[in-house]
Each structure stands twice: as structure tokens, then as C-alpha cells.
């Protein structure tokens, strides 16, 4: 009879406070992404605690996580606020993306295996078949398209095999997505479908130079479209 060693204990179930913090975090994140809180608006822990029926400690824990996502700023007086909409902020985010994402993409092209290729192809297929706008959501990108768009870009980067770099990608993506959702489609002459097709084609052809060139151009056009109107 084969003997086995002692099994590792299961992780403890989430406590009530942890569950509440998760719920408040998810609510805050969704509310900010929907635009329920205007750019620059204060996120007052006392008000949020009263609205959600939870303690200040739970709200503060959730707010710290939202700050980590790039969806809120922590102010010098220890308050919190939604990031203010400014050209400088979004151009800084765009510069960071243009610096980091081409490196990740090149690593993916060089390291990605056949499973990575399949994920990229599937993500691009989903994106290409998802309408960017719906009558219900007007001139803003639809939730379904926004998620398909994120999954495609994430799939392109996943072949890099570096979870730390992917965490950086996720944070920058969330911050730029917030800016994009606050803006409308300001470049109607842009052919995003073709840009994504060229990205997929170059990546799967293992042409790192072309893939990164297309990506930089893609990110530059996105940054130009997110420039705040005067």
C-alpha cells in the first residue's frame, strides 16, 4: 500500500471583512469605470461607508486597492479622488505603454508557444466579431467590445512569460481604459479593425520588428484620440 505524506491544509475561507472589502472594491471599480464618479471627484470614505452599509476600515481597504489599479489617487491629506482628466496624465500613461508594451510583445513573439498562438487567434476572432457600439450605449464603446479588446491585447502579451511585466500591463491598461471610457470615438477616420488584424498577422508570423512597429503606431493613435478637448 502506497503511503502519502500529509496534505497541505486548505486556505482559510474568506472572513466577513474580506468578503465585504471584495464587494465594496468591485462596486467602486465598476462605478468609476461606468463614470458614476466624475473625473477629479472626491471619494469620501465616510460617504461610501454609509452608502454601502460597511465600516470605514472596509472602505479604506477597498480604496487602497482601487488606487493600486490606477482608478483613484491618494491625496496628500490622506483623502481619495478619481483621477482628474488631463492631457498630461493620459500622455504620461501613453508614454509608459509605448515603452513597456513593445518589449512585452517582442518577448511574446520570441517565446510564445503554439498555445499562445491559439489564444491570440481566438482573441482576435472574438474582437473582430464584436460590434464596438450598441444602440443602448450610444457613442461610447460597448462593454462587450471593451472586454474583447482587452483580451486581445492581453493575449498578445501573455507569451512573454513574465507575470511581473503582465501585472504592469494590466495596471496601465486599466488606467488608459478609464480615460478612453471618458472620451468618445474622436478619430472616426481610424481603421481599428485593420490595425488589430496587422497586429495579429505580424505576431503570429513571428515578425517582432513589424509587430512592435504596428503596436507603437496603434498606441500613438490611441493616445491622440484620448487628448482632452479644450
Where are these regions (language model features)?
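C-terminal all-alpha effector/ligand-binding and dimerization domain
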Residues: 2, 16, 128, 174, ...
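Short linear motifs at protein or domain termini
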Residues: 1-110, 227-230
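Amphipathic coiled-coil alpha-helices
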Residues: 100, 123-126, 130, 141-144, ...
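Short loop-to-helix capping motifs
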Residues: 45, 161-163, 206-207
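Hydrophobic, amphipathic alpha-helical faces that serve as interaction scaffolds
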Residues: 96-112, 150-186, 225
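Amphipathic alpha-helical dimerization/coiled-coil segments
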Residues: 100-132
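Hydrophobic packing residues in well-ordered alpha-helices of helical domains and bundles
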Residues: 93, 120, 145, 149, ...
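Short helix-coil transition/hinge motifs at the ends and kinks of transmembrane helices
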Residues: 9-11, 132-142
Amino acid at each position: 500500500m502506497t503511503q502519502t505524506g500529509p496534505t497541505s491544509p486548505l486556505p482559510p475561507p474568506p472572513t466577513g471583512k474580506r468578503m465585504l472589502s471584495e464587494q465594496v472594491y468591485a462596486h467602486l471599480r465598476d462605478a468609476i469605470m461606468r463614470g458614476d464618479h466624475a473625473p477629479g471627484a472626491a471619494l469620501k470614505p465616510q460617504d461610501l461607508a454609509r452608502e454601502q452599509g460597511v465600516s470605514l476600515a472596509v472602505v479604506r481597504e477597498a480604496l487602497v486597492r482601487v488606487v493600486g489599479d490606477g482608478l483613484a489617487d491618494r491625496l496628500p491629506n490622506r483623502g481619495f479622488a478619481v483621477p482628474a482628466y488631463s492631457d498630461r496624465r493620459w500622455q504620461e500613461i501613453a508614454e509608459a505603454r509605448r515603452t513597456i508594451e513593445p518589449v512585452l510583445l517582442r518577448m511574446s513573439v520570441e517565446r510564445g508557444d503554439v498555445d499562445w498562438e491559439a489564444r491570440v487567434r481566438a482573441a482576435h476572432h472574438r474582437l473582430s466579431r464584436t460590434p464596438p457600439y450598441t444602440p443602448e450605449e450610444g457613442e461610447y464603446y460597448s462593454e462587450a467590445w471593451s472586454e474583447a479588446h482587452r483580451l486581445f491585447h492581453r493575449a498578445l502579451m501573455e507569451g512573454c512569460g513574465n507575470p511581473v511585466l503582465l501585472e504592469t500591463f494590466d495596471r496601465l491598461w486599466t488606467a488608459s481604459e478609464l480615460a478612453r471610457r471618458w472620451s468618445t470615438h474622436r478619430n472616426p477616420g481610424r481603421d481599428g479593425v485593420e490595425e488589430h488584424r496587422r497586429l495579429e498577422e505580424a505576431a503570429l508570423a513571428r515578425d517582432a520588428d513589424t509587430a512592435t512597429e504596428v503596436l507603437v503606431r496603434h498606441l500613438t493613435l490611441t493616445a491622440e484620440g484620448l487628448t482632452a478637448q479644450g
